[in-house]
Amino acid sequence: MGRLALISVTDKTGIVDFARQLTEEFDFEIISSGGTAKTLQSAGIPVIKVGEYTGSPEILGGRVKTLHPRIHGGILARRDWQSDLAEMEANQIRPFDLVVVNLYPFEQTIANPDVTTAQAIEQIDIGGPAMLRASAKNFAHLTVISNPKYYEQYLSQLRQNNGEISLEFRQKMAGETFALTNAYDGAIAAYFASLNGETTRFNLAGNALQTLRYGENPHQSATWYGSGTMAQGWGKATLLQGKELSYNNLVDLEAARRLIAEFGSEEPAAAILKHTNPCGVAIGGSLVEAYTKAFNADAISAFGGIVALNQAIDEATAKELTKTFLECVVAPDCSPEAQDILAKKSKVRILLLPDLTTGEKQTVKVIAGGFLVQAADDVVETPDEWRVVTEKQPTPAQLAELLFAWKVSKHVKSNAIVVTKNQTTLGVGAGQMNRVGSVKIALEQAAEAAKGGYLASDGFFPFDDSVRTAAQFGIEAIVQPGGSLKDQDSINAANELGLIMVLTGIRHFLH
């Protein structure tokens, strides 16, 4: 008898050509089930159906097809154990040389926001993972392939090794398979956690998208993984031009995406970041105005920065973008005319990400011996929910300015202070160990332009020194979360100095 392959795939990419080469070039017999058998038979490839081989028909609407001793015995049998071989002979079980299986599209199914629980459950594969895990466990005696990208490598192994498959390759395929089943079960567990609330286990899995040149620094290795279906996110971004993305590029781009997402897409907005902190953010009457305002907010820091735009890049904006060196520019789209202009700066990475507003619902940080998971800080706030605590009341226009400053402060490393005017950042104080230190940095950067401006603080003021410093620079209104035992001291200082103060009740620390 020739070699025996078991093929049962949902993703039929390349399966016909692969099966044809197995049968015609290497004398494989193929056992297959359901839609895979029909696909191969319609292509003229001889197939033994699972039901014919096992003597048991598919039952329960196809829920039970391959869960049979003649299938799993042929997968799990140890070819160097006489007792296993004797049992196989007694039960007319043939050993498989190759198992090719991929799984029902569970993650793609639950990516649909309208999917019902019943629909999701029907896409939980049972037989597929069972065959994959059994095959991977027994890699010493057979090969398992769970991804079409390995079909050609398997054929090359046969050709180069006189029809044999190396143990190294079989072990590699086993590892890939266990990683797949782990991720698949993790997605199912995460789905049920979303239905039931918090769970005692958290699974984090992904597919390697790219081996990066290095991490934050040249001596650190790094890999980019994609999670879930990647229906959104950077794995779906189009790189129009420029070199491949680096680790630092991706970290900065995600920070820029989160910030620009605050402003939706109706009003043109631009953000420029360095080392994940904004150095210039603005809203304008046009995209080019928004970008120009953001750039001029801190032209020195903008050099080599990451730019995020919430509308398609037009010709006028493209011309401004080419006037300085930038690492990356991301926008939802780019006109052909703008592309031609940007091409003159071929080293600038231009990315298109149509949906800049959709991000992960959780954030993860690795610590020694584990990791921390928290809900993303994606709360949507409006001034209607805020509390004015000073005698002086803000106008609607002033509240709009405070909201702009508040949105930006959320994306600055704590302790964070943002000074703005005309919906443009004037000064950003980031990452200082005391809040008044960040206040001074932001105000000194804004300098005389701070007069009549607005100040946002991501955390409360422990003392009134920040308020008094702001008043010295002519700040008109302050927005902060409140919550200090000495809130009243800051409120009293604001009243004494004629400032407006608004408390949001929500803190936005960023570490």
Swiss-Prot record:
Keywords: Hydrolase, Multifunctional enzyme, Purine biosynthesis, Transferase
Domains as described in the record: The IMP cyclohydrolase activity resides in the N-terminal region.
Sequence similarity: Belongs to the PurH family.
A Pfam family of this chain: AICARFT_IMPCHas
Keyword Lyase (UniProt): no
Name of the protein described by the UniProt record: Bifunctional purine biosynthesis protein PurH
This protein's pathway: Purine metabolism; IMP biosynthesis via de novo pathway; 5-formamido-1-(5-phospho-D-ribosyl)imidazole-4-carboxamide from 5-amino-1-(5-phospho-D-ribosyl)imidazole-4-carboxamide (10-formyl THF route): step 1/1; Purine metabolism; IMP biosynthesis via de novo pathway; IMP from 5-formamido-1-(5-phospho-D-ribosyl)imidazole-4-carboxamide: step 1/1
Reactions listed under catalytic activity: (6R)-10-formyltetrahydrofolate + 5-amino-1-(5-phospho-beta-D-ribosyl)imidazole-4-carboxamide = 5-formamido-1-(5-phospho-D-ribosyl)imidazole-4-carboxamide + (6S)-5,6,7,8-tetrahydrofolate; IMP + H2O = 5-formamido-1-(5-phospho-D-ribosyl)imidazole-4-carboxamide
Domain MGS-like span(s) in chain numbering: 1-146
InterPro entries associated with the record: AICAR_Tfase_dup_dom_sf, Cytidine_deaminase-like, MGS-like_dom, MGS-like_dom_sf, PurH-like
Listed GO MF terms: IMP cyclohydrolase activity; phosphoribosylaminoimidazolecarboxamide formyltransferase activity
GO terms, biological process: 'de novo' IMP biosynthetic process
Keyword Transferase: yes
The enzyme's E.C. designation: 2.1.2.3, 3.5.4.10
Cellular component, GO, one term: cytosol
Record organism: Microcystis aeruginosa (strain NIES-843 / IAM M-2473)
PROSITE patterns xref list: MGS (PS51855)
